[in-house]
């Protein structure tokens, strides 16, 4: 049996707003979607797709999975996220190979921006 990772599903209250944020940030077009849901990409794409699923209320507590997004310039990446409605948490980690900052999307889902040297 051949198994393959096809995507990540994100629970959202405002599916349209959150999916639009990620579509611009990752330059991923909207694909065929079910009513009320939004898919970025398609399950047959070479890259895993992002699926945005509606939920009635926000989850309390920290989610134990997050996305990592590589950028060419960390400061421009931070500015882009903020311009799209996201937020910089203030958490920054400097390593020999690069820098990682923790960001959130418009609903507070944490993710990392990374610039490698």
Where are these regions (language model features)?
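Short connector loops at helix/strand junctions that flank enzyme active sites
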Residues: 35, 45-47, 60-64
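Short, conserved, surface-exposed binding loops centered on an aromatic residue
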Residues: 30-31, 59
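Basic side chains
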Residues: 17, 28, 62-64, 92
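Vicinal oxygen chelate
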Residues: 2-13, 31-32, 39-53, 57-117
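Short alpha-helical
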Residues: 17, 47, 76
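Amphipathic alpha-helical segments
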Residues: 14-29, 81-82
């Amino acid at each position: 049996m051949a198994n393959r990772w096809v995507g990540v599903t994100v629970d959202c209250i405002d599916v349209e707003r959150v999916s639009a944020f990620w579509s611009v940030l990752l330059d991923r077009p909207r694909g065929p979607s079910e009513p009320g849901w939004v898919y970025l990409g398609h399950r047959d794409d070479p890259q895993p797709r992002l699926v945005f699923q509606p939920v009635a209320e926000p989850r309390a507590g920290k989610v134990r999975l997050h996305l990592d997004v590589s950028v060419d310039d960390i400061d421009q990446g931070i500015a882009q996220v903020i311009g799209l409605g996201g937020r910089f948490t203030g958490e920054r980690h400097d390593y020999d190979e690069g820098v990682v900052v923790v960001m959130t999307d418009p609903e507070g889902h944490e993710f990392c921006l990374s610039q490698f040297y």
